[in-house]
Design a protein with these regions (language model features):
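N-terminal signal-anchor/first transmembrane alpha helix
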Residues: 1-39, 255
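Short membrane-interfacial helix/loop motifs at transmembrane-helix boundaries
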Residues: 2, 34-70, 223-225, 272-281
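Transmembrane-helix boundary motif in ABC transporter permease subunits
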Residues: 3-16, 84-116, 189, 267
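Interhelical loop and adjacent transmembrane-helix boundary motif
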Residues: 11-18, 60-70, 212-273, 281
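Non-cytoplasmic
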Residues: 42, 47-50, 125, 129, ...
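Transmembrane alpha-helix signature in integral membrane proteins
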Residues: 44, 70-100, 185
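Membrane-interfacial helix termini and adjacent extracytoplasmic/periplasmic loops
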Residues: 50-54, 60-61, 109-110, 122-155, ...
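Membrane-cytosol interface at the C-terminal ends of specific transmembrane alpha-helices
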Residues: 99, 144-180, 187-193, 204-208
């Protein structure tokens, strides 16, 4: 076994092609998982002085510090409330629009679809600043409504394009078969079309929820100091301290709900559901 650890012996044992594949895989794993492992290490380090490879002392000192902040619990609650509200409202407005774009042909349809890409085509800070000026005029600054609208603007591309692709992939013959069996258009939609399009809708919902949970710039600008979500609270606490462990602890706290949601919805998440959403027909 230990002889196989010799690089030269390993190279001759597996061959040149397999050896190169192993090296590329090792580099990829190091590149992908290295920062995550470093973050975990730093989060549980009571004392850590760069450039030391390992912490000088392990423990939960900085976890206690973070959970001792009064703003943490309220910011977590606000993050979940805003993310859920953003996801639900986006579905109410965007799913019908996605179905319309998938099933009907009308003048300006492609231009309308491309318009949903504009929010991701320009620097977000510039868009947020322009929207903030408009919100100030209508009294939406520092309100939940203003923050939710900002979060919805970021999610509209996913909530329209991905479900639209999912609806296009539902064959009309299946809907017509349900209609021939006596189902009404509404019943056909909820019993046939919607369940078959659910993988694409689930992926869009996931992107919307996670995007809302992680949105910081728009929340800080529109929410002012009144609305503190987790990313906003993280910025404030991290800037008040020079300890890098605080940032690592907050990063883990932000990752946990995202990882749990991805695990729950894993059966709906596939490359075809994601890639298919960015094809215009």
């Amino acid at each position: 076994m230990f002889k196989m650890l010799n690089p030269r012996r390993f190279y001759h044992a597996v061959g040149k092609k397999k050896f190169l594949e192993f090296i590329l895989l090792a580099v990829f794993i190091l590149f992908f998982y290295g920062p995550l492992l470093n973050m975990l290490m730093v989060a549980f380090a009571n004392e850590y002085n760069v450039p030391s490879v390992l912490p000088q002392e392990w423990g939960f000192k900085w976890w206690g510090y973070v959970f001792g902040q009064k703003s943490l619990v309220s910011s977590m609650i606000q993050s979940f409330i805003i993310a859920i509200a953003t996801t639900v409202i986006s579905m109410i407005f965007c799913i019908p629009a996605a179905y319309s774009l998938a099933r009907f042909q009308y003048p300006g349809r492609k231009v309308f679809m491309l318009s949903f890409l504009l929010t991701n085509a320009f620097p977000k800070l510039g868009i947020y600043t322009s929207i903030a000026v408009l919100f100030y005029k209508y009294g939406l600054m520092g309100t939940y409504a203003g923050v939710i609208i900002i979060h919805m603007i970021n999610s509209m591309m996913f909530m329209v394009w991905l479900p639209s692709s999912a609806f296009r992939n539902v064959h009309r013959q299946q809907e017509e078969a349900a209609r021939d069996a006596g189902a009404s258009p509404v019943r056909t939609f909820f019993k046939v079309t919607l369940p078959m399009a659910m993988p694409g809708i689930a992926v869009a919902t996931l992107y919307t929820f996670l995007g809302s949970m992680e949105e910081a710039q728009g929340t800080m600008l529109v929410g002012l100091a009144r609305i503190q979500t987790m990313p906003v609270a993280m910025y404030g606490i991290v800037l008040d301290s020079s300890a890098i462990q605080i940032g690592a602890v907050f990063a883990i706290l932000l990752i946990i709900p995202s990882a749990l949601l991805i695990f729950v919805m894993r059966k709906y998440i596939g490359p075809e559901a994601i890639a298919g959403g960015f094809k215009m027909k």
